[in-house]
């Protein structure tokens, strides 16, 4: 007996299911990588590595790794230079300034307080995107963002968390979600549609490294003996996270990408529990559930 379901229809159905899970997987993967790197950055500045080195050297290492990948694949050519303006602004807004602000702020802030401010990234993105993407903004997307923010705040604003920090450090940390949001919007609106994601990630990181490396202590040959390993690990994680970022940017907008901030917060607090021995709380359990609801609402909203 012949099947009543045409192969092409079945294939489209399977592809549709795959696309539904694709965005949440990107959000969770990128958010987890970024959260681990924030924890490593906190550790790096704690053992005495200068904040500017923590912000820039892993970025340069990630650029080298991605450039090496392009050379091995034979994909490095003159066309990579076409998008230099994109490399400059996407890198400044979404990478260099947030990295510098976060490493300087983490000298004084604990990870929980810093996580509160990272959680503001979706809110700033929502505010920045209103003039440009109002047609794609639905009540389910807005609700998804709000639920995600509540999830992150539920684990960072509990009475057990110490949030007494210098105002200067809080002000610097506030720059992180503001510039991350601006970077989200710029990348989505200026994204070169046919560009290779690896080329974009490598080009952006390389240009930013050329700008900022002269300001690091590495140019003078000054290294913390036990800091090389953590910076190398951060470089590897950064390379993977930026590669995933540009792949994800092809299928989402600034609002969609902003959901990464919620994952960063929840995963960051989870790392605090395992690394610093903080207790497993009901707030964290509730946050994970709310985060899943947030991702579902946003990724199943009709434009």
Describe these PLM feature segments:
Residues 33-38, 70-113, 118, 154, ...:
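Specific transmembrane alpha-helical segments of multi-pass solute transporters/efflux pumps
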Residues 53-64, 93-94, 99-141, 176, ...:
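Specific alpha-helical transmembrane segments that line the substrate/conduction pathway
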Residues 66, 88, 128, 137-159, ...:
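Hydrophobic transmembrane alpha-helices of multi-pass small-molecule transport proteins
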Residues 2-57, 162-189, 211:
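Glycine-/small-residue-enriched transmembrane alpha-helix faces in small-molecule transporters
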Residues 2-6, 41, 46-97, 124-125, ...:
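Transmembrane alpha-helices of multi-pass small-molecule transport proteins
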Residues 27, 82-90, 137-149, 169-170, ...:
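Cytoplasmic-side transmembrane-helix entry/capping segments in multi-pass membrane proteins
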Residues 31, 56-57, 113-120, 186-208, ...:
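Helix-helix packing/entry segments at the starts of transmembrane helices
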Residues 19-23, 48-56, 79-85, 157-178, ...:
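Juxtamembrane helix-entry segments on the extracytoplasmic side of multipass membrane proteins
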């Amino acid at each position: 007996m012949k099947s009543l379901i045409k192969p092409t229809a079945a294939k489209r159905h399977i592809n549709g299911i795959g696309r539904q899970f694709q965005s949440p997987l990107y959000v969770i993967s990128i958010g987890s990588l970024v959260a681990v790197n924030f924890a490593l950055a906190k550790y790096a500045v704690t053992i005495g590595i200068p904040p500017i080195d923590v912000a820039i050297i892993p970025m340069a290492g990630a650029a080298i790794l991605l450039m090496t990948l392009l050379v091995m694949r034979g994909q490095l050519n003159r066309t990579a230079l076409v998008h230099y303006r994109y490399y400059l602004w996407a890198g400044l807004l979404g990478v260099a300034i947030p990295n510098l602000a976060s490493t300087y702020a983490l000298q004084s802030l604990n990870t929980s307080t810093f996580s509160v401010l990272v959680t503001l990234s979706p809110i700033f993105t929502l505010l920045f995107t209103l003039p440009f993407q109002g047609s794609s903004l639905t009540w389910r997307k807005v609700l998804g963002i709000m639920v995600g923010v509540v999830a992150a705040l539920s684990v960072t604003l509990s009475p057990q968390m110490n949030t007494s920090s210098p105002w200067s450090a809080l002000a610097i940390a506030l720059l992180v979600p503001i510039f991350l949001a601006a970077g989200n919007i710029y990348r989505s609106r200026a994204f070169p549609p046919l560009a290779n994601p690896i080329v974009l990630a490598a080009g952006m990181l390389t240009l930013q490294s050329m700008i900022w490396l002269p300001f690091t202590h590495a140019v003078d040959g000054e290294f913390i003996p036990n800091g090389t390993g953590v910076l190398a690990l951060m470089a590897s994680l950064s390379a993977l996270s930026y590669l995933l970022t540009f792949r994800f940017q092809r299928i989402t907008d600034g609002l969609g990408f902003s959901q990464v901030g919620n994952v960063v917060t929840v995963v960051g607090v989870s790392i605090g529990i395992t690394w610093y021995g903080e207790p497993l709380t009901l707030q964290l359990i509730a946050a994970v559930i709310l985060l899943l609801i947030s991702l579902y609402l946003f990724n199943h909203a009709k434009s």
